[in-house]
Amino acid sequence: MKILKCKYILCCDESFKVLENHAIIFDKKIEKILPNDELKSLGILDSAQVFSTPIAMPALFNAHTHLEYSANKAHLDFRGFSNWLKSVFENRGGISKALNQKILNKEIKKLLKSGVCGIGEYSSFGLEAKMLAKSPLRSRFYCEILGTNEAFLEQAWSAFLERFKSANELKNERFCPALAIHSP
């Protein structure tokens, strides 16, 4: 059992209340939140790990990310979804070549530092799967299959199946592969 004693707890309830001088009792999930002065009455202080922090708040989940594009932000057009999607298709080949572990690691650290605990990562190439599977982020890893020219259908389908199989081999408590089917 762990106890996190907090000066303030920012709640994301309907009223966004702020609890002052409260503690969060948890193991794998939150069991109880109560005022700090009620901790002694529970009789668990001697057997629990006790930590303290000035502020605690819920972590954030970014439901739709594209970390594989992190190396190409300057080449993509962010003036609306249609412009962005067009720029992704135009720069598709360079996107996968420019990505590396250093860039991915930097992006994962930025997410964690900003309070993000989990992501829905949409991936066309699968290059970020191994790194996400080992990271502290919780990831729903969507293997994308994009609409394609009929001449390349078999090739695109085979590549997708291989990416999805590889992602499933990495599945763990924090990394869960899934499917994302697009047809632009």
Label each PLM-derived region with a short phrase:
Residues K130-P184:
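Metal-coordinating catalytic core of metallo-dependent amide/deamination hydrolases
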Residues L99-K110, S123-L127, Q155-F164:
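Short, acidic/polar
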Residues M1-L42:
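N-terminal metal-binding scaffold of metallo-dependent hydrolase/deaminase domains
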Residues D37-L45, K130-P136:
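Short loop/helix-cap segments at secondary-structure boundaries that form the rim of catalytic
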